[in-house]
Each structure stands twice: as structure tokens, then as C-alpha cells.
Amino acid sequence: MRSIFLLHFDYKTCEEEDFEDWNLADGKCLNGAKYMYKRRKQDARCLVKRTFKDMILHEIPCDSCTESDYECSSEFVRDAKGDCIPDYDQIALSDICDKANGETVSLEPLQLIKGDKCKKPMEIEAMNIPCEKILRESSNGKKIATIENKFDFEI
């Protein structure tokens, strides 16, 4: 079997045209960037003849941000349709309405995911949250309680 292989292979060193670009995620933006590696073509009949090194990742930031580059802000949650809607429990626990003195507070429902590399942010329309509708005590002076579980057996 070895002699058949040797008859069809001349130990040629790979040239630049023996390599191709390989794009992660089919060349689509992922975390605000396109990622690409160079790899040897599948049908290339050559040897790289270099000491192995990790492939070099080429990262190209995307020009404009899309919805996939964003997550809901901390005061919002996703609904069944995937839209960010106000999380009134979270808003009640925060001091956002305390600072607004019971008035309406304006919040952006989306925030850019940390570490995202897209260049041009989307225009996000702020939502007005009426603080007077949030029934709660003032968050000032609230205590955090913890409960410790005790077990009456040995492990």
C-alpha cells in the first residue's frame, strides 16, 4: 500500500495557493466580528513542512451591530416572542425609581453584550417606565436575609 501512495505523491512543499480561508459561522458576524482561519485545501497534494503552530485567528469587526449583538438590560426580561419587556420585580428591587422620585424613568431595553466588537451601535428606543405603578416599599434600608440549613446526621 505504501508504494501506491509514493507513486502519486512527490513531496512538494505547500505554496500559498494550497491554502484556503475557512470562516467560522459561514462568514456571518459572531459577537460583532467575522472570524477566519487559513487551512490547507482538502485536495492539496503537498506537505506543509513546517513545525506545527496553532492556527492564527483573523478577526474582522463587523461594521454595524445587529440584534444578536445585544441582550436585555438588567431591568428587562425576554418574553415568548423574544422581545425585552420590563421586569417590574427587578425594577422594584433596584433604586431606579427612588432616584426618579416616583416619576417616570426612561430605560433602554437592550444593552450591547460585553466584549462584542461591532463598530456602529443600533439606535435603541428607550422605554418609559411609570414608577408610580410599581407597588413596593422604598428600597432604602431593606435588609438581606439568609437562611442556613442544618442537618442532624453525619456523612
Curated annotation (Swiss-Prot):
Gene3D superfamilies, per database record: 2.10.70.80, 3.30.60.270
Signal peptide (from-to): none
By its UniProt entry, which InterPro entries does this protein fall under? Sortilin_C, VPS10-sortilin
Recorded superkingdom: Eukaryota
For this protein, the parts annotated as crossing the membrane are none
List the PANTHER family: SORTILIN RELATED (PTHR12106), SORTILIN-RELATED RECEPTOR (PTHR12106:SF27)
User: Which protein is depicted?
Assistant: Uncharacterized protein YCR099C
Protein source organism: Saccharomyces cerevisiae (strain ATCC 204508 / S288c) (Baker's yeast)
